[in-house]
Amino acid sequence: MGAVTARRCVEWLLGLYFVSHIPITMFIDLQALLPPELYPQEFSNLLRWYSKEFKDPLMQEPPVWFKSFLFCELVFQLPFFPIAAYAFFKGSCRWIRIPAIIYAVHTITTLIPILYTILFEDFSKAIAFKGQRPENFRERLTLVGVYAPYLIIPLILLLFMLRNPYYKFEEKRKKK
């Protein structure tokens, strides 16, 4: 597989990631931040099912720090998703490099406390988490599996933007 083909495969993966992230953010994640009357009952039921099935305490009773991440997702990330999807599906858009690096670093940074909380929080003693919560290590790993793609794909994006020779190269404009 040639370098161009490999680059296009990664760009398509990233494009699919950003397209899929739009409805997940709008219809699931932001329910923990926005007023409930904005959402039809079907979406509320979907969130309730997810929260109970995966025992996600962050989505059942979101702590303030988690809501701050959701606010950033609404204000900064959601507007970026269609732009990034366009750039990666179109391909060869060098202008996406810096915004993609900023997005990747921001997302990776927010996932670290989320994953740390899921793995190490003593939910039995934590007063901030009142709903269902993971009770054993297997349930914690299942929940980590839900969040892990939002760490892994941005990490791939970051490395791709930093290491791929096509995106590292800056074209110098000719002076007239």
UniProtKB/Swiss-Prot annotation:
Which GO molecular function entries does the Swiss-Prot or TrEMBL record give?
cholesterol binding; oxysterol binding
Cite the EXPERA domain residue spans from the record.
Answer: 10-158
Q: What is its main location?
A: endoplasmic reticulum
What PROSITE patterns does UniProt report for this protein, alphabetically?
EXPERA
> Pfam families, per this entry?
EBP (PF05241)
Site (Important for 20(S)-OHC binding and stereoselectivity) at 150
User: Which segments sit on the Cytoplasmic face?
Assistant: 1-9, 90-99, 162-176
Q: Where does this protein hold cholesterol?
A: 75, 77
Q: Which UniProt keywords apply?
A: Endoplasmic reticulum, Membrane, Nucleus, Transmembrane, Transmembrane helix
InterPro entries reported in the protein's UniProt record: EXPERA, Sigma-2_receptor-like, Sigma2_recept
Assembly, in brief, is: Homodimer. Interacts with NPC1; the interaction impairs NPC1-mediated cholesterol transport. Interacts with PGRMC1 and LDLR; the interaction increases LDL internalization. Interacts with histatin 1/HTN1; the interaction induces HTN1-stimulating wound healing. Interacts with TSPO.
**Similarity section:** Belongs to the TMEM97/sigma-2 receptor family.
User: What name has this protein been given in UniProt?
Assistant: Sigma intracellular receptor 2
Which organism encodes this protein?
A: Rattus norvegicus (Rat)
